Amino acid sequence: MYLNDTLKNKARKPQLELQPRQKCWTRLPLRRLFATNIGYTSANNAPHNCRAHWKPWGVAFVVAAFCALPHAVMGQDEPENKGLTLRGSIQTDMLVPENDKQTGATKANGDFLNNTYVELGASLKNIDVGLRLEYLQYPLPGFEPDFKGWGVPHYYIKWQTKRMELTAGTFYEQFGSGFVLRTYEERSLGIDNSLLGGRLKVNPLPGVFVKALAGKQRRYWEHNDDWVAGGDLELNIEQWLPGMQEHDHYLMLGASVVNKNEPDEVIMTDASHRLRLPRNVMAYDVRARWQHGAYNVLAEYAQKGQDPTADNGYIYRHGYVAMLSGSYSKQGLSLLLQAKRSVNMGFRSRRSMMGTSSSINHLPAFTLEHTYALPAMRPYATQPLGEWAYQASLGYKLKKGTALGGRYGTALKLNFSHVHGIDQNVHGTKGTDGYGSAFWAWGDATYYQDLNLQMEKQWSHALKTTLMYMNQRYNKTVVEGEGGMIHANIFVADVKWKMSPRTTLRTEAQYLQSKDDDGDWLFGLLELSLAPSWMFTVSDQYNSGSTRTHYYQALVTFSHGAHRLQVGYGRTKDGYNCSGGVCRYIPATKGATLSYSYNF
């Protein structure tokens, strides 16, 4: 979620709705196929308005498509089953929680927690069908009670030719950089904002790509009643001008439009006045990408109409985002420069929702996503109400055989990111346009800043080291709701030793120095890999500042073919799991874990 939406009161667990909804005691609805419910809801001890019922037409839709595939093959003048492809996957993550007074971990949600996903798909010639079963009857910590349930929320049938693709059912889509539309699944964050409806993709001419779609957006185990519709056009100009390709020039022009249709509702400004809410909110996006040799430049601008929502305090200010990104890359050298300004660009299919629920678009964070534990401890969450964001990244590889490069060469990476608030001239509240903001004007607050330098050096065939330094400024008040500015210096050393062709030992040592928040942190990790199947990992994250708490973990991982099994035991610190500037708060845990995945 965008953290400041729901975390201003940390004692309260994140809730994604402003008003509570009455729930069935046991709620396991699957989902509608268009206007038809599919699934089962238990009536035991349920409120009088919750009824047990089966309406399996949606499941029958996909099952029939699966069953029809072999018969379709038999009807061809080809050997039976030629061209039929079946695929699937299973992923399950389990936790047996324990109470832990020192970390605050509890087993309040049950003695056994589990998130399980099973996907099945089949394709024959130009027909593709698929479905996904999800079981979250006892969801993992950090997932709201609305996730509780099981069902088949994802199912589709797709028909594809050389120039056209037609999808009916649920689907994911992105227009451009996602400023006006991005639907996607991110299981670790509990995000699945897919659309249930139809989508058409057409490539009528070389270099011309058209998309059109309409649907209702998923919200937990339901779909909002509001409609989302849109279209996208991309033109690859070099396809029409052969001279451009001959001189290694490529130009893409794109445009998108998205509309959300939402009925009126009662939102009061005071005891006697209510808001007049727009039924349709339009958003537009235009973009251009130019490539030549090692150079790549992208410019994109999106704008949204008046859209009073719970996110922005029900103001009527137009929203927009402008982005400019340039990169250069050749052997041994890479450079990235980016800048982005966004104002009031949260976009949801349901205006009263907050957190991650019902988001139509996506605003990427111009900050580096770290993989080491301490640098990743305080990630940045994009602020949809407005921000200026900048990022610069430089990569350089010192040549082999030089004094600094050594025998195998040395890779250097320098990254700097800075996110700042926008200037706001506030002149109104709910029911007005809220504030004015000059385009180039900064606000008073720095939201986030990260300067990091990383060096990777291969000393020999068996030994490799990675060293990293990071200076971080993290505005906890802006991102989480309280806490002030946190300054930290972080040091990382990673040593990888290939002891034999099948045995590798990797160690990590990390130190975070800070006079703010919880003070200093230490982290250590030892990882032994026995190829091709086994990996043993032990780690400890220790707060040497105010809490003096150890967060230890032990993991054993076994891989064989498409199977992967991991079992473990330990503690995890409360914090934020983020991806692309979208975050979810995860409470502290202690207990045994098991994860299994399989693909076929």
Model-predicted segments: where are they?
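Polybasic, lysine-rich low-complexity intrinsically disordered segments
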Residues: 9, 13, 23-24
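Tryptophan (W) side chains
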Residues: 25, 54-57
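Bacterial N-terminal signal peptides
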Residues: 58-70
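Beta-barrel outer-membrane channel/assembly domains of diderm bacteria
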Residues: 59, 74-173, 179-180, 195-214, ...
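Exposed, low-structure sequence patches enriched in small/polar residues
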Residues: 91, 106, 113, 244-248, ...
